[in-house]
Amino acid sequence: AERIRYKYSIKNVTGLNLLPFVRFDDPFEIIAHLMVGSEGTLAFLSEVTMKTEYDYPYKASAMLYFKTIKEASRAVVAMKKLVDETGEWTVKGAEMLDYKSLSSVNDPVFLKYKGEVASSALPGVEPGDETGLTAVLTETKARTPEELQQNISAIEACLQAFTTYIPVRFTDRPEEYSKYWAIRSGIFPSVGGTRQPGTTCLIEDIAFHIEDLPEATAELQQLIARHGYNDACIYGHALEGNYHFIINQSFSTQAEVKRYEDLMNDIKTLVVDKYDGSLKAEHGTGRNMAPFVCHEWGDDAYKAMKAVKELFDPQGLLNPGVIFNDDPQCHIKNFKPLPLLVMSDKRQATSLVADKCIECGFCEVNCLSCGFTLSSRQRIVLQREISRLKQSGE
């Protein structure tokens, strides 16, 4: 029971949800909570009722810049400890953006930093090495303007112990802080849009315990670079120890597949073996992490998960291969191709734009044709399949 509680003291959706077994005695409550995050492996959910959290009326945000990712992580750990007189966390959000994330959106502070590094104007930073700059988009919320100002003052006092690249400046003006959050929300499609044509944009989702964040974050960045993913980025919910990292991967040769396999094995070693973290923090185990569920949880917990699966789905009909997969190499098989579009000369300009699409679906909320005919993403998916069939001769 203590092991289960410890694993869920941070975000964790690796495997089935075991927390209900230590939180509830009522079988109905256990079953209902088991369904959350089961990814269709136990049952089909036709309807869900969600409760929303309180929306604080007063908010302020600041984009904090640090010269190293380790210093940024230390600041996050310190801010995590801030609480007000009622016991509420002072900082409600801290989103980390590494140098590649900032570069992908042409962040003006990053461009300034890059210029100073290039001209050797920053003491202690190697000329031309802009890889250290890291931003932490920090948010605080309150019920009154006075409470908001108290929160800002507490955070500013906390940050005096750390070296920032530019002075700390909070803003409570929506027209200003909305620009910060637009940068954050645009990272995934922006990084994906810079990938080499024909490669696949992959995003993973891990979590560390907050006390391990400074060392673990720096080691994660070094690990990804060591495998040659020079266009990769790390960003995400640092306040929860939860990061996403994006890599642009080719699967066109066996050597590239092997490079990806080696990366995932080293990620497993870093996250699980060294820091006892979560290989999947919030977006589901799927097939890519299915081979590592037992490694993260251990034999006893994995057997308990399989016993639950057999109770609900003894014939293995529901979402086969997801979460539970007997093939230890299922994550390096059956890759979804993203072929370059084959179009007429007149439509070549269109194909160059469409080839950048990573099929994230973020465009569909603004798509004028979605729901009437095909959405823009569906059109690109179909065009890619047509191109694949033409290229393969099928």
Where would I find each of the regions flagged by the language model?
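Long, charge-dense accessory insertions within large macromolecular proteins
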Residues: A1-L19
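Alpha-helix capping/hinge segments and adjacent helical runs
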Residues: Y275-A281, P314-L318
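Generic recognition of well-ordered alpha-helical segments
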Residues: T41, A75, D266, A304-A307, ...
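Activity-critical C-terminal alpha-helical subdomain
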Residues: S190, T194, P291, H295-A349
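Hydrophobic, well-ordered secondary-structure elements that form the walls
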Residues: F245, H283, D313
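C-terminal substrate-recognition/cap domain of FAD-linked oxidoreductases
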Residues: N12, P20-F28, A32-D262, L270-S278, ...
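Secondary-structure capping and boundary motifs in well-ordered enzyme cores
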Residues: S38, D212, I234-G241, E256-R259, ...
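Ferredoxin-type iron-sulfur electron-transfer modules in oxidoreductases and energy-metabolism complexes
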Residues: Q329-D355, E364, C370-E394
